């Protein structure tokens, strides 16, 4: 498989497949490690699109590795430092090179750690309805894309494949994982966001919001896992396109979301259930270009 061939699904025979997520295929490596292969699949509204985004898996992996290295002083991460190619057969290396991470097997927390620095997406919709986001009361008079007085932590429960993640108040997170761990996750997630957002702003990118995932290692240490600060887990806006009161142009999959919002299936708006309508070639190409530009801008 050449580097330019899109990978919709990995097919490794040398390792047992544990799960196919919306984007990543996870394989067991012994009892204590996982091989995470980032495919070129794209999901929006928790539905996986039928068309791969060429180069996406490699770009996601490069960006995640970039951030893991930059944020390692705040919290440990799941990387082992071992080469993904070392655990597959020679014939399978082309499926993993550049798009995989060999990571520690952790006990994942059942709550996603979402941090918002700006009002956007579901947060903006909820604010219009009741002046708050996930139980966090916000000042009146904010607009779509307004910068918040300070970043807010708005957890969500993890959805099963095909279901929608559900925003929950912090109090519910405390009930699920306990107060000490919930408070640690909130503190660490906000620190990660603030550090990354300040760096990205210096590169001309606003990180409006992002989602972190954490797990516990065998010693019970909180560990950053999965992906981090990629266009799949974050809303990235170029500073030159930013203004309050609009949906700023973005480097993430918002471009696909916007197209899907106006997509018609059988004469009706798409109901955000699988299967998704086929993405036009120009939407695929422009999305691939957005991912590429975000990485180039951040790492320049």
Curated annotation (Swiss-Prot):
SUPFAM superfamilies listed in its UniProt record: SAICAR synthase-like
UniProt xrefs under Gene3D superfamilies: ATP-grasp fold, B domain, Phosphorylase Kinase, domain 1
Example of a GO biological process term: 'de novo' IMP biosynthetic process
UniProt similarity note: Belongs to the SAICAR synthetase family.
Originating organism: Methylibium petroleiphilum (strain ATCC BAA-1232 / LMG 22953 / PM1)
Alphabetized CDD domains for the sequence: SAICAR_synt_Sc
Catalytic activity: 5-amino-1-(5-phospho-D-ribosyl)imidazole-4-carboxylate + L-aspartate + ATP = (2S)-2-[5-amino-1-(5-phospho-beta-D-ribosyl)imidazole-4-carboxamido]succinate + ADP + phosphate + 2 H(+)
Protein's recorded name: Phosphoribosylaminoimidazole-succinocarboxamide synthase
Keyword line: ATP-binding, Ligase, Nucleotide-binding, Purine biosynthesis
Highest taxon listed in the record's lineage: Bacteria
Any GO molecular function: phosphoribosylaminoimidazolesuccinocarboxamide synthase activity
Classification via PANTHER family: PHOSPHORIBOSYLAMINOIMIDAZOLE-SUCCINOCARBOXAMIDE SYNTHASE
Pathway: Purine metabolism; IMP biosynthesis via de novo pathway; 5-amino-1-(5-phospho-D-ribosyl)imidazole-4-carboxamide from 5-amino-1-(5-phospho-D-ribosyl)imidazole-4-carboxylate: step 1/2
EC number: 6.3.2.6
GO CC term, one of those recorded: cytoplasm
Pfam family, one: SAICAR_synt
């Amino acid at each position: 498989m050449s580097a330019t061939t899109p990978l919709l699904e990995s097919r490794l025979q040398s390792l047992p497949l544990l799960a196919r997520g919306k984007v990543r295929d996870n394989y067991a490596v012994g009892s204590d490690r996982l091989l995470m292969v980032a495919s070129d699949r794209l999901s929006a509204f928790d539905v996986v699109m039928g068309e791969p985004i060429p180069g996406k898996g490699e770009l996601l992996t490069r960006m995640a590795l970039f951030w893991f290295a930059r944020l390692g002083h705040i919290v440990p991460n799941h990387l082992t430092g071992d080469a993904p190619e070392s655990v597959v057969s020679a014939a399978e290396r082309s499926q993993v090179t550049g798009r995989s991470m060999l990571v520690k097997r952790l006990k994942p927390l059942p709550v996603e750690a979402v941090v918002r620095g700006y009002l956007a997406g579901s947060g903006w919709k909820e604010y219009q309805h009741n002046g708050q986001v996930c139980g966090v009361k916000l000042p009146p008079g904010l607009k779509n894309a307004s910068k918040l007085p300070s970043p807010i932590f708005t957890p969500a429960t993890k959805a099963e494949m095909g279901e929608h993640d559900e925003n929950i108040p912090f109090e519910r997170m405390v009930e699920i994982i306990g107060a000490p761990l919930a408070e640690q996750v909130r503190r660490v997630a906000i620190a990660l966001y603030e550090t990354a957002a300040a760096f990205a702003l210096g590169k001309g990118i606003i990180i409006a919001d992002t989602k972190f995932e954490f797990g516990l290692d065998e010693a019970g240490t909180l560990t950053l896992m999965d992906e981090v600060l990629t266009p799949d887990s974050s809303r990235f806006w170029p500073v030159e396109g930013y203004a309050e009161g609009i949906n700023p142009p973005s480097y993430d999959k918002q471009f696909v979301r916007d197209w899907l919002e106006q997509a018609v299936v059988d004469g009706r708006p798409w109901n955000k259930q699988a299967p998704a309508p086929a993405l036009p070639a120009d939407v695929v190409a422009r999305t691939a270009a957005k991912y590429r530009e975000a990485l180039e801008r951040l790492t320049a």
